[in-house]
């Protein structure tokens, strides 16, 4: 039985509606899949950027922390240096004060004579030369001469050797030093400095650990004494 034109048109419309519906469903499926893939990619990009930002700020935080440590270390070192300078300045002031007090010793002639006797004899024992020359300040010449005269027989008895000791009257020690003597061997190549300043410096070096301990207390980090 042949289909009428109306039936044919009806079937065509039905087929077109089916095709259109299928096309719409396919398009919706594609859109949904594309949106899903977009959301996944967007999430991945967001996560990647978030990780990069976190990594950047973690790196910055570490750099800032490192800079803080360096600055703190520098500040501590500067503070430590200031303390050390202050300590050295205090010790220097004490030594300068001690040097100024040496002039009081020299003014006491009796006390100064005893001191010169010891310095001259000690210098002779240190050199142990057959001929020695003593230098002193011009104003100390009489006292040093007396000290040499006392020292020669004591030296001879102790060493069982003769000795010729002369006082240099051509080249005296500077008048601005506190006092004491310098003793040379015969050709002046060897010298023993027994001026009051040199003796004070020597004593200061030997007693520096005790001085620091008395002024500032013991240093727990110091393994050896100066």
Curated annotation (Swiss-Prot):
Residue numbers of N-acetylalanine PTMs: 2
Compartments (UniProt record): Apical cell membrane; Cytoplasmic vesicle, Secretory vesicle, Synaptic vesicle membrane; Cytoplasmic vesicle, Clathrin-coated vesicle membrane
GO cellular component, one term: proton-transporting two-sector ATPase complex
An example Gene Ontology biological process: proton transmembrane transport
Source superkingdom: Eukaryota
Keyword vocabulary terms for this entry: Acetylation, Cell membrane, Cytoplasmic vesicle, Disease variant, Hydrogen ion transport, Ion transport, Membrane, Phosphoprotein, Synapse, Transport
Bilayer topology: Peripheral membrane protein
GO molecular function: ATPase binding; proton-transporting ATPase activity, rotational mechanism
Pfam families: vATP-synt_E
Expression tissues: Kidney; localizes to early distal nephron, encompassing thick ascending limbs and distal convoluted tubules (at protein level). Ubiquitous. High expression in the skin.
PTM-bearing positions, type Phosphotyrosine: 56
Principal subcellular localisation of the protein: membrane
Annotated PANTHER family: ATPASE H+-TRANSPORTING V1 SUBUNIT E1A-RELATED
Disease: Cutis laxa, autosomal recessive, 2C: A form of cutis laxa, a disorder characterized by an excessive congenital skin wrinkling, a large fontanelle with delayed closure, a typical facial appearance with downslanting palpebral fissures, and a general connective tissue weakness. Most ARCL2C patients exhibit severe hypotonia as well as cardiovascular involvement.
Family: Belongs to the V-ATPase E subunit family.
Assembly and oligomerization: V-ATPase is a heteromultimeric enzyme made up of two complexes: the ATP-hydrolytic V1 complex and the proton translocation V0 complex. The V1 complex consists of three catalytic AB heterodimers that form a heterohexamer, three peripheral stalks each consisting of EG heterodimers, one central rotor including subunits D and F, and the regulatory subunits C and H. The proton translocation complex V0 consists of the proton transport subunit a, a ring of proteolipid subunits c9c'', rotary subunit d, subunits e and f, and the accessory subunits ATP6AP1/Ac45 and ATP6AP2/PRR.
Known function: Subunit of the V1 complex of vacuolar(H+)-ATPase (V-ATPase), a multisubunit enzyme composed of a peripheral complex (V1) that hydrolyzes ATP and a membrane integral complex (V0) that translocates protons. V-ATPase is responsible for acidifying and maintaining the pH of intracellular compartments and in some cell types, is targeted to the plasma membrane, where it is responsible for acidifying the extracellular environment.
Protein name, as recorded: V-type proton ATPase subunit E 1
UniProt organism field: Homo sapiens
Lineage, broadest ranks: Eukaryota, Metazoa, Chordata, Craniata, Vertebrata
